[in-house]
């Protein structure tokens, strides 16, 4: 074989290997997606209504329903594991869980240690008013926020006074909440945007085939998310 033919042969071999490599991407180093087809999906649950809701029986919540449907598409069933956020994400980091859900967003510092899907739902927060009300300036105004909602900090940063309530739907004054909830309450959303969160689901580090499959599933649900959240709140 002369030098020209040798170079051509090497080039053809390299291209063939490149094509073969691309055909098998993305990969799961720990073969998580392949394993899930043969066993229950180990799902870490972090309580965070309406995303994950603890009940006396089967767990409920928007992300619980999403993962239940995703598992069904893969021909398996979820195996639920309750715990705190750090505990669950540490287990995920060491491949003891396959997925962790709990209203996580892309602001989590755990992105250095575990994998995440692409953001699948953007949750925007505004100040809103009951029908017929008007608000010129939020500064100095009392604004109701449900207890435990971190958006209260954003309200205070605007110079408003936060009133913490159990249920914002019973308030007859300015309210700060997610847009999907304000719409459900039939409140009028003002131009006072407070925050915007991108929701994600956590997976083990490096398991790219699993992330791709889950991303594809979540993409098909993107237009349903607002309605799913409103339905979950209506069940309370």
List the predicted regions and their residue ranges.
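Extended ligand-binding regions for polar small-molecule ligands
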Residues: 23-25, 61-73, 132-156, 195-236
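Hydrophobic/proline-rich hinge and linker segments of small-molecule sensing/allosteric domains
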Residues: 40-47, 114-135, 201-204
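Extracytoplasmic small-molecule ligand-binding "clamshell" domains
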Residues: 22-104, 109, 151, 162-163
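Sec-dependent bacterial lipoprotein signal peptides
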Residues: 1-22
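A ligand-binding cleft/hinge motif common to bilobed small-molecule-binding domains
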Residues: 102-113, 168-196
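Hydrophobic residues within well-ordered alpha-helices
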Residues: 70, 92-93, 168-171, 214
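Short, polar loop motifs at secondary-structure junctions
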Residues: 103-105, 130-133, 146-152, 178-182
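Short, well-ordered beta-strand segments
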Residues: 42-46, 142-144, 175
